[in-house]
C-alpha cells in the first residue's frame, strides 16, 4: 500500500457528487462519518477498526481550491478532525501511516525548531492546504503563460508558495510552506477526480495548474515522479 497520497479538491465537483473526494479522503484514513438519526447530517466521526478495514490507514494530503475553502469551511474541519482521530489510534506504524508520519514530524519539529510537543503535533498534523484567505489559483498557470520559469524546480516553488497555507481547527490559512513542501516530497500517488463530461483536462489550465503542479512539486522535491490518477465517476 502507498503511505502517502495527495488529492486535489475542487468545490463544484464535490457539490455535484455529494462529496466523493471527501468520502475518499476519510476512507483512505479508515474514518467514517456518524450521521444524526433520521437525517444525513454528520454529527461526528468514528474509526473503522483495522480488522474491518483490512489494510493500513493511508496518509492523505489535500490541496484545496480557493472556492472549496470559501464554500466548505465545515468540511475542512471534518477532514482535519479525521486526521487527528486517525493519528490518535494506538496502532502499529505499519498499519497506521497517519500516526507514523505525524509522530516523525512532531519529533523533528521539537528537535530542530524547539517547539513544545502540543504545538509541534498540531503543526505536523495539518493535511488540508490551500491558498491564502481571499486568493485563488495554484500559481502555475500564470507562471507558464508568462514563460517566467526555467526548470521544474521553479514550478514546484510557486506551487508550494501558493498552496502552503494550512487549514484546520482554529488555523485558517497559516503560511507553512516548509510543512507543505515536506508533504509534497513524501507523496507516492496523486489524485484528481472528475465527476462529469462537461469539462475535462483540455478545457481549462486549472487541471494542469492544480494536479500538474502537484506532480511537478513531487518530481522536484522527491526526485521521482509519483503515480498519478484521474478518477472517473461520470457514470455514478
Set out the residue ranges of the language-model regions.
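Ligand/cofactor-recognition surfaces for anionic moieties
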Residues: 1-236
Amino acid at each position: 500500500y502507498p503511505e502517502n497520497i495527495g488529492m486535489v479538491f475542487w468545490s463544484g465537483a464535490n457539490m455535484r457528487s455529494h462529496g466523493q473526494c471527501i468520502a475518499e479522503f476519510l476512507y483512505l484514513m479508515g474514518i467514517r462519518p456518524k450521521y444524526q438519526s433520521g437525517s444525513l447530517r454528520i454529527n461526528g466521526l468514528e474509526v473503522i477498526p483495522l480488522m474491518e478495514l483490512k489494510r493500513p490507514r493511508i496518509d492523505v494530503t489535500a490541496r484545496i481550491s480557493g472556492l472549496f475553502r470559501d464554500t466548505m469551511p465545515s468540511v475542512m474541519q471534518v477532514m482535519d478532525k479525521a486526521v487527528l482521530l486517525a493519528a490518535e489510534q494506538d496502532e502499529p506504524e505499519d498499519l497506521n501511516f497517519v500516526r507514523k508520519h505525524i509522530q516523525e514530524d512532531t519529533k523533528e519539529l521539537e528537535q530542530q525548531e524547539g517547539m513544545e510537543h502540543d504545538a509541534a503535533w498540531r503543526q505536523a498534523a495539518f493535511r488540508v492546504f490551500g491558498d491564502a484567505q481571499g486568493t485563488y489559483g495554484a500559481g502555475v498557470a500564470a507562471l507558464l503563460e508568462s514563460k517566467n520559469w526555467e526548470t521544474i524546480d521553479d514550478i514546484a516553488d510557486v506551487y508550494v508558495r501558493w498552496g502552503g497555507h494550512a487549514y484546520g481547527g482554529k488555523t485558517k490559512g497559516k503560511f507553512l510552506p516548509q510543512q507543505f513542501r515536506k508533504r509534497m516530497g513524501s507523496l507516492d500517488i496523486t489524485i484528481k477526480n472528475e465527476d462529469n463530461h462537461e469539462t475535462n483536462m483540455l478545457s481549462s489550465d486549472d487541471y494542469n495548474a492544480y494536479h500538474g503542479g502537484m506532480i511537478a512539486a513531487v518530481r522536484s522535491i522527491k526526485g521521482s515522479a509519483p503515480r498519478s490518477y484521474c478518477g472517473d465517476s461520470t457514470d455514478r
